[in-house]
Amino acid sequence: MPTINQLIRKGRKKVKKKKTAPALQGSPQKRGVCTRVYTATPKKPNSALRKVARVRLTNGIEVTAYIPGIGHNLQEHSVVLVRGGRVKDLPGVRYHIVRGALDAAGVEGRKQGRSKYGVKKPK
């Protein structure tokens, strides 16, 4: 424990909060180009083939982003919009691709929770 004198001389060090999505550099979203689209397997208690993509952002940083929803139309060189938000059971995946924006189409046949998957209101 520091003495009062030591605190006057040095002061307390502020604890820096870790950024959740550093590659976005403070932006809400960033545009990027898919360099690889593939499936990944989740961590221990879960089992699936999660759809993910390596995306090179406009600032030059390459990140791994999750493709939400059932089915997608993304392939290499697709232009996508990337937002923050990790996938708990995929280590290293800290970003999501925004469905219904740029080249990523909305989820086909989606009726509920449509705004999260870029689906227009059915007629």
Swiss-Prot record:
Q: Kindly list the cysteine pairs connected by disulfide bridges.
A: none
The alphabetized UniProt keywords are: Methylation, Ribonucleoprotein, Ribosomal protein, RNA-binding, rRNA-binding, tRNA-binding
CDD domains, per database record = Ribosomal_S12
Q: Where is this region: Disordered?
A: 10-32
Q: GO MF annotations for this entry?
A: rRNA binding; structural constituent of ribosome; tRNA binding
Tell me, which GO biological process terms does this entry list? translation
Tagged with keyword rRNA-binding:
yes
Pfam family membership, one = Ribosom_S12_S23
Q: Which residues carry this modification: 3-methylthioaspartic acid?
A: D89
Pull one GO CC term from this UniProt entry.
small ribosomal subunit
> Could you confirm whether the keyword Manganese appears in this record?
no
Q: Where is the composition biased (Basic residues)?
A: 10-20
Q: How does it assemble?
A: Part of the 30S ribosomal subunit. Contacts proteins S8 and S17. May interact with IF1 in the 30S initiation complex.
Family designation? Belongs to the universal ribosomal protein uS12 family.
This molecule's function is given as: With S4 and S5 plays an important role in translational accuracy.
NCBIfam families from the xrefs?
rpsL_bact
Q: What is this protein called?
A: Small ribosomal subunit protein uS12
Q: Which organism is it from?
A: Halothermothrix orenii (strain H 168 / OCM 544 / DSM 9562)
Give the lineage. Answer: Bacteria, Bacillati, Bacillota, Clostridia, Halanaerobiales
